[in-house]
Amino acid sequence: MSELTSLTIAEARQKLRAKEITAIELTEAYISAIDAANGRLNAYIKVTPDLARVMAKNSDERIAAGKAGELEGIPLGIKDLFATVGVHTQACSHILDGFEPRYESTVTQNLWDDGAVMLGKLNMDEFAMGSSNETSYYGPVINPWRAAGSNQQLVPGGSSGGSAAAVAAHLCAGATATDTGGSIRQPAAFTGTVGIKPTYGRCSRWGTVAFASSLDQAGPIARDVRDAAILLKSMASVDAKDTTSVDLPVPDYEAALGQSLKGMKIGIPNEYRVDGMPDEIETLWRQGIAWLKEAGAEIVDISLPHTKYALPAYYIVAPAEASSNLARYDGVRYGLRVDGKDIVDMYEKTRAAGFGKEVKRRIMIGTYVLSAGYYDAYYIRAQKVRTLIKRDFELAFDAGVDAILTPATPSSAFGVADENLAADPVKMYLNDIFTVTVNMAGLPGIAVPAGLDHKGLPLGLQLIGKPFDEETLFKTAHVIEQAAGRFTPAKWW
């Protein structure tokens, strides 16, 4: 890793403004790093070096003129779920072959308006459906981390695996990601990076390929808490084009870092102690509690009694919304088209060829739970459970809790093509056990690296906050980060 690519966003920002480095130099360093590493990691599916150089040149001109934006000259990777004008946007699916949008997503436009530079589009699970980044049409992403003494390839988590791997391997300064049931926080935990899923409505969904519209939310993956705070400030905005966007001012999240935790109450939910959870995860959780206690926070036990129903309810609601959202991909207007003897045959052949196995599975689950005779038994009941989950959190926060601390994942990163997980999709779905409640309740959640397991792989802790109180999450996560230190993989790629 070069000296330039090892800079955090905050460090690079300072050097760019002081004119110690140029945006062109920084961008070229990342382009070289991607060229050298992407063949092994498969984090990027489309690199845009020419566009990056033009954007970097423009940044240098604005810096020279004293008109630097908040992210001026900072090279970023963009998850392939965000529409980027004239640049490949496929949600890593065969069915969107060759699709290049004529418009820009609100989130990416916000970043460009603040001066960021686009390095390319990042790999992900197809249509964001997966927990390992193995469902991508472009093949799996490889985690930059390896277990001590092992050459086994590990997954980076999903669906934002490309984002997490690129950030961990220093192939971008930071990355955009999305989270429907844990797709920012789980990959962050698996790669020793920081990922925040903001409150539902904090970042616009306009121009972001939809998976489950009532659950999807964009957020950043970054190397540390400060960088995540810087990125979220630029990504977040109110947007008239997204009816779920909330009209609240975007705070200066970075200003929250370093604030005292004295007087804060941190809730510890007993329901997150699940059967089969490794002792290492429990030990890490206790360590996190101790760090926050030392920082002046009061630790209180809380109950979130409907947590056990969250995963089954999520895997009804999310596929139901996905089956509706993905009905639009039919080969008529854009993307893949497989010719048939008539229009119905063309639809069927296009969808059969265009969607991957996991996407088909979830479409079928969703169509089933929305069908006559099952709608009330499954979908309506799942929505009622969702209301109860949200109510559990409301009661905890009403009782004076400021944030909730839990593990981020039930394990560290597992192997690529794990036979046990491939044979039983439910085991793969259990990766989301600690994260789905946050999406079901529309709350903010952040994953922060907190230690290494016995194999030397990163483990993360999760903080859950009140609606639109990301500032509390950032300041609390910063305390954990300061106590735990930062974690970087040994370079093998």
Curated annotation (Swiss-Prot):
Homology family: Belongs to the amidase family. GatA subfamily.
A Gene Ontology molecular function term of the record: glutaminyl-tRNA synthase (glutamine-hydrolyzing) activity
EC numbers on record: 6.3.5.7
Protein name per UniProt: Glutamyl-tRNA(Gln) amidotransferase subunit A
Catalytic residues of the enzyme: K79, S159, S183
Pfam families: Amidase (PF01425)
Main enzyme class: ligase
Keywords for the protein's UniProt record, in alphabetical order: ATP-binding, Ligase, Nucleotide-binding, Protein biosynthesis
Biological role stated in the UniProt entry: Allows the formation of correctly charged Gln-tRNA(Gln) through the transamidation of misacylated Glu-tRNA(Gln) in organisms which lack glutaminyl-tRNA synthetase. The reaction takes place in the presence of glutamine and ATP through an activated gamma-phospho-Glu-tRNA(Gln).
PROSITE patterns referenced in this protein's UniProt entry, alphabetically: AMIDASES (PS00571)
Signal peptide: none
Gene Ontology biological process terms in this record: translation
Domain of life: Bacteria
Subunit structure, as described in the record: Heterotrimer of A, B and C subunits.
Organism: Rhizobium johnstonii (strain DSM 114642 / LMG 32736 / 3841) (Rhizobium leguminosarum bv. viciae)
Annotated SUPFAM superfamilies: Amidase signature (AS) enzymes
One GO location term (cellular component): glutamyl-tRNA(Gln) amidotransferase complex
Catalytic activity reported: L-glutamyl-tRNA(Gln) + L-glutamine + ATP + H2O = L-glutaminyl-tRNA(Gln) + L-glutamate + ADP + phosphate + H(+)
UniProt-listed InterPro entries: Amidase, Amidase_CS, Amidase_dom, AS_sf, GatA
